[in-house]
């Protein structure tokens, strides 16, 4: 069963691009679609994954280390907590590839 989720982060586009560069170009296993939108106070991430386990593996093995690396390079000595994640029941996805 697919997994759809949303979370907001207090980051700008430049920080997002640095995190993406740290993650690399390889498409994460199980990712169906990932959107990033400007939102009040930062960026909103919307993801659709094959499963919650695929999202969690990507978060733990790729996203979290990349965020820590970028924030440490920016001078952070403590890492902020993970943002709250809202989960949704996925009804449909249309993509024009």
Q: Where on the chain are the PLM-derived regions?
A:
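Short S/T/G/P-rich N-terminal loop/turn motif that feeds into the first structured element of a domain
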Residues: 1-46, 50-68, 72-97
């Amino acid at each position: 069963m697919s997994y759809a989720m949303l979370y907001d982060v207090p980051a700008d586009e430049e920080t997002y691009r640095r995190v993406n560069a740290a993650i690399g170009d390889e498409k994460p296993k199980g990712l169906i679609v990932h959107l990033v939108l400007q939102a009040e106070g930062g960026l909103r991430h919307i993801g659709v994954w094959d499963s919650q386990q695929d999202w969690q593996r990507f978060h733990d093995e790729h996203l979290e280390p990349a965020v820590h690396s970028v924030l440490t390079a920016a001078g952070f000595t403590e890492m902020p907590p993970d943002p709250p994640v809202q989960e949704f029941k996925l009804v449909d996805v249309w993509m024009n590839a």
